[in-house]
Amino acid sequence: MHYLPVAIVTGATRGIGKAICQKLFQKGLSCIILGSTKESIERTAIDRGQLQSGLSYQRQCAIAIDFKKWPHWLDYESYDGIEYFKDRPPLKQKYSTLFDPCNKWSNNERRYYVNLLINCAGLTQESLSVRTTASQIQDIMNVNFMSPVTMTNICIKYMMKSQRRWPELSGQSARPTIVNISSILHSGKMKVPGTSVYSASKAALSRFTEVLAAEMEPRNIRCFTISPGLVKGTDMIQNLPVEAKEMLERTIGASGTSAPAEIAEEVWSLYSRTALET
């Protein structure tokens, strides 16, 4: 039996998430892409040229889940999805769980299993806290914190079950890994007006991941946080209030600005490092 690792990447239809999917696929992983709408997942995170250049065993699909609707998205009977192929048009699918694609891809010779989760979906704040509505605050917290925590717990349960079910996974690839994409704004030293709720959501995610790492280390699951500064071409850059963007640029300087591909490289470095430590 060949065991083939799969990555789940949220917020993967554009920006940092898209770059991460491209990097992981390039490195030989299969990917389950999560986007917020059916329309967004139709814009696959990996272009057809790269898909065709992938290895024969690699698979890719996309699933639509609106994280703003936490916790109700947990109760859906099925999720709209699309599976992508090297040699034929995409096929619309219905998936009963996030791990359904792995079961559909597996056969008597190959077992696909989720070994990596990257929580990259994020929602920015566009005004001062006093001008941010209760509904907007709820959306920010649901997307940036509540849903990532839930995704993390769902995947950790799956990872622990996989380790018990297939003991031979040990040594096959990198250790099961969670990577949560936070922000430089999570730091108490960064006080940028117009980002208060967003910063709080990212601080919560960072602290959650720090403590979770200690909880999961005895269970052979690694948990990491990446806290980028300004990332070119992302929604955070485009949606930040002008004053907040200018202040952030002055505060972090040129060294704090990066490209999505750099974040993707850091994700791969963390994941592949766990293979060396196994």
Swiss-Prot record:
This is 3-oxoacyl-[acyl-carrier-protein] reductase. Keywords: Fatty acid biosynthesis, Fatty acid metabolism, Lipid biosynthesis, Lipid metabolism, Mitochondrion, NADP, Oxidoreductase. It catalyses: a (3R)-hydroxyacyl-[ACP] + NADP(+) = a 3-oxoacyl-[ACP] + NADPH + H(+). It is found in: Mitochondrion. Its EC number is 1.1.1.100. The keyword Zinc-finger does not apply. Belongs to the short-chain dehydrogenases/reductases (SDR) family. NADP(+) binds at residues 13-14, 16, 36, 40, 44, 66-67, 77, 122, 125-126, 198, 202, 230-231. It comes from the Eukaryota. Pfam families: adh_short. Present with 1760 molecules/cell in log phase SD medium. The active site is at S182 (proton donor), Y198 (proton acceptor), K202 (lowers pka of active site tyr). GO terms for cellular component: mitochondrion. Disulfide bonds: none annotated. It comes from Saccharomyces cerevisiae (strain ATCC 204508 / S288c) (Baker's yeast). The gene is OAR1. It is an enzyme of class 1 (oxidoreductase). CDD domains: SDR_c (cd05233).
